[in-house]
Amino acid sequence: SGNLNRISDMMNEMSEKDKRRLRVVHHDLRAEENDMLAADLGKFNFILHMAASSHVDRSITDPLTFVYDNVVATCNILNFAKKSKNLELFVYFSTDEVFGPAPNKVMYKERDRYNSTNPYSATKAGGEELAVAFENSYQMPIFITHTMNVFGERQHPEKFIPKCIISARDNLSVEIHSNRNKTKAGSRHYIHACDVADGCLFLIKNRNKIVKKIKNDYGGAKCPKFNLVGPVELDNLKLAKLIAKSVGKKLRYKMVDFHSSRPGHDLRYALDGSLMKRLGWKPKVSIEKRIDQVVNWTLKNKRWLKI
């Protein structure tokens, strides 16, 4: 779902020492791997499969592209990974949306039933099932993560937080998706990209201990799953007000009935993060500090709001 300019921009901010640790290999993941790709990549121990098309609106207007990007590409990567003799862990990066809308006070656990309500979440669920099948069929070591609404610096301006930053800066009205009566805003557990990275590193570094600790939790089911959850649940109106406050403006907004304006969208998603907390991980920085961090960076790097 990203822009390759993000990688080059981040590399420009890296030290020469860190740059030497990074190599970019270009390949269309919808195409099967070839000998040249294998030679370029060389030996590897870990794969974090985070590549995906992720915008719900686009998945509704163009579902087949999402099938190619999120299902076919995942199958190709798994096929490539299973040939490695050095693979220690494959992490498939999934989404809270595979569970569908969450009623009030319901927080979905890792092994709860799936209920995809749009093509994006359906293709991510399909990728998950492929990961489970590959672990069962080929004894590949695989973890699956679910995250909720990742945000951060350089986020695509089509997403809610960059839109709010632009609207607050320019004194424009923000659309807040709500229930049919326009009295209650949708809510999420927003999580910063740095916290997601921290959670993934925690899983990688502690993978052997984790497998032993949870092996009896789900009756020995393959592919352990982990919810990486943000610090607090936050409705979108409160989030927009936090952003406007950080920008230094008063929020202008209107509540919009999301049912009629955005088919395939859900008012509330919610994940139970108790498993990761029990294992010893939770986000280290408050949502307020993360919002300030992103707003300040974005206003200083305005070109990212135009990409």
Regions picked out by a protein language model, each given a short descriptive name:
Residues 1-150, 293, 300:
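N-terminal Rossmann-like NAD(P)+-binding domain of SDR-like oxidoreductases, especially those catalyzing
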Residues 19-20, 27, 168-307:
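C-terminal substrate-binding subdomain of Rossmann-fold SDR/epimerase-dehydratase oxidoreductases
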Residues 77, 134, 160-168, 199-203:
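A short, amphipathic alpha-helix embedded in the catalytic core of nucleotide-handling enzymes
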Residues 106, 157-165, 243:
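A glycine/serine/threonine-rich, flexible loop-to-helix segment
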Residues 116-123, 153, 157-161, 189-193:
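The catalytic Tyr-centered alpha-helix of NAD(P)H-dependent dehydrogenases
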Residues 126, 130, 134, 164, ...:
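Hydrophobic alpha-helix immediately C-terminal to the catalytic Tyr-X-X-X-Lys motif of short-chain
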